[in-house]
Amino acid sequence: MIRHRLTALALAFGASFVPFAPACAEAPAIHTQVPGYYRAAVGDLEITALYDGYVDLAASVLLNANKAEVQRLLARKFIAGEKVQTAVNAYLINLGGKLILVDTGAAKAFGPTLGFIGEQIRAAGYTPEQIDIVLLTHLHADHVAGLLGADGKPQFPNAEVRVDQAESDFWLSEANAAKAPKDFQPFFKIARDSAAPYQAAGKWKPFSGAAELAPGIKAVPAVGHTPGHTAYQIESKGERLLILGDAVHSHAVQFARPEVAIEFDSDKKQAVATRKKLFAWAAKEKLLVSGMHLPFPGLGHVRADGKAFAWVPVEYSPLRNDK
């Protein structure tokens, strides 16, 4: 009897001390990516990669290789399907006294997956109004349309814009636009519209050849993709970054097969020759390189691989001061 009472008391005592278990609310999925910026150092300079967004390109735009070979190379990188997600990047260079932006993204020229350069600049701790110089690799819409904001006004009102003279002459010519295929004519208009307010303000300033555009920043003529396509070399304290522009569109295909052109190249033979030359230079000199269509942040190295090349992306890293 006593044992039964003790058991009952123990059960009652234990029941009164059931630990409180708070109700757990469901955690909804966020469905958005983290801000698209990434910092790296080149000597004393701080480089910020900016993610404008992405565009899905058909694998069929890659030329000089049969479809089976292209699909094989894509599959090696676990890229499946006919559409290939392709990043659109830009790069912000902090010189200490000046801020220089290389390319401006697509604005909304290619739909809602692009056009986030202004947003990423702010997320990175700057404002578009702080940009002193915009360097353009070329005047295709996904590089120049971001000169204008959503309101149609200059997104970088305090910046002067530098671009190769031949590139400027070609794309801003109404005569060239009239001779172009009809479905390509809108891209001439985008270039003209993007440049117009900067021209009116006296801030559109073309250069020629291998010009030095700021301390440690040189233009590297890289024609072929367009008539005045330009790469840029950034140098500080013996360290160098080569911004390739559109010398490469597909990391999965064009490093392994640098002879593969893309439908958008204005001079495909020259574009291939330029790509091979830039890749060989980057590999020999062990340059840090970046590209506007390499997977974000688009920073890495080029390694020689027989008669071809391999892309070696950088490891995510803090900005170290212990070197």
PLM region spans:
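Active-site metal-binding motif and surrounding structural segment of the metallo-beta-lactamase
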Residues: 87-90, 96-98, 111-162
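Bacterial N-terminal signal peptides
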Residues: 8-19
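Cap/insert and terminal regions of metallo-dependent hydrolase folds
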Residues: 111, 231-233, 237-323
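Active-site metal-binding loops of divalent metal-dependent hydrolases
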Residues: 52-53, 104-107, 139, 166-167, ...
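Sec/Tat signal peptide C-region and signal peptidase I cleavage site
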Residues: 20-25
